[in-house]
């Protein structure tokens, strides 16, 4: 026999599942967008150490985001972590091989690696 108590319990269970599957993902998407935007804004403003922390935080939540990895790789290159930059670009390429940006960014990082390792400065300067 169906009682009003059973109906209330059924509605409650349906309500809980709807919240889990419809409301939670939209919150998650907003959090994702907010984290990405914050990291990108810090990068654009030249606050690279803070940007690196934010990209790390973002990638803790979304480790398979190729764009996030590529952007973190760019920040790593700017602060002098050339090998870390190349690693991030390689991961981004493996996740999304049709995206061109990580290939370009990896090439820039590899060029920087070669340029910096073979760079010799003159010991005397002529005026």
Each language-model region and where it sits:
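Conserved structural position within tetratricopeptide repeats
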Residues: 57-60, 91-94
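Helix-start (N-cap) detector for alpha-helical repeat units in TPR-like alpha-solenoids
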Residues: 32, 66-67, 100-101
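Register position in tetratricopeptide repeats
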Residues: 44, 78, 112-113
